[in-house]
Every structure is written in structure tokens, then in C-alpha cells.
Amino acid sequence: MSESKRDMTKADANKRMSAGSAREANSTLVMALAGAAAGAFGVWALDRVDWFLWDHEDPKARTQTKAVRPGGEPPAQALVTRSEEATGTVLSPEAHETISQAVHYAIGIAPAVGYALLRDKLPGTGTARGALYGAGLFLMQDEVLNTVTGLGAKPQQYPWQAHARGLVAHTVYGIATELALNLISKAPNKSAATNN
């Protein structure tokens, strides 16, 4: 093979590798965005279940839950309050609530991005995998991280109903996130259709 043909073959191989790397990076970005969208849907579903269960919970359990929460607030609101105190900022009640809701969604979206990128490497399939993801997230966030960061009380201070409600709501979050990712992955790829 002549030197010029060898150089052309090398250049073609480099172009193919670059194109493959670009497709892989694009695929990763698309999957991360899909994870963010699915996570937002998951948080929305979690909220519906959590609020329903909260509204039907024993009033004594609700009172105990509020009493042990830092400042009587759920973790996202407690984080916003802590940020206000650290920066000397005073938000209006409406701004505090809006920012707290954004933080709450961010707390649910961030792990969903990771889940979307890694879910094919995780045990289980379909909604069972989503349920395991949601239950695992409940254990990590609600039972461990909220306590360690001071955004929640020690788990034993909450009534059993709070743990049950959290587990059910987060399991629904995981299933909803998985279903949304499945739906997104089955959507027609318009850019692929226009390139063919």
C-alpha cells in the first residue's frame, strides 16, 4: 500500500472515530436531558402521592412530623431557609416557596440524570428497576442525607407513617421516572429520519 493511501486510510479511520465520539457524546447529552425530563415527571408524580397520603395521614403523625423537622419545614424549604440565613437574605414568603419548589425539583432531577445514564447497567428491568431506584433514593436521601446534612431529623424521631409515606412516594417517583424514560426512548428520532 502506498504511503498516500495509508495516510488516507488513517485519516478516514480518524474521521470515523471522531464521528463515533461525537455521536456518543450526543447520545449521552440526549440521555441526560431525557433523565432530567423524566426526573421532573417523577417528582410531579411523587408530589401527588405524597400530598394524598399526607392529607389522609393520622393528624397526630402529621403534627409529630412537623415538630421534628428543622424549622418545621420539609428538606427543600429547610435548605432555602439555611441559604437565606447564611447569606443574610430575606425572601418574601412567595419567593421562599417558589425557590423551595425549584430546589425540590432539582433534588429529584439530578439523580434521575444519573439514573438515565446508568440504568442499563443496573439490576432489574422496567418498572421493577424503577421501583428499586425510587426505594434506594428514599433510603439515601430521606433516611441518610437529610439527617447528615441537618435538613431532616434523625429517622427514629419521625412517626412510622412518615417513613411509609416517603417510601411509597419515592417508589412511585422511581416507577414514573422509568416509565417516562421508556416513553422518551420509544419516541421517533426525527433527526435520524431526516438524515436517511
Spans of model-derived segments:
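Short amphipathic, positively biased membrane-proximal segments
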Residues: M1-N196
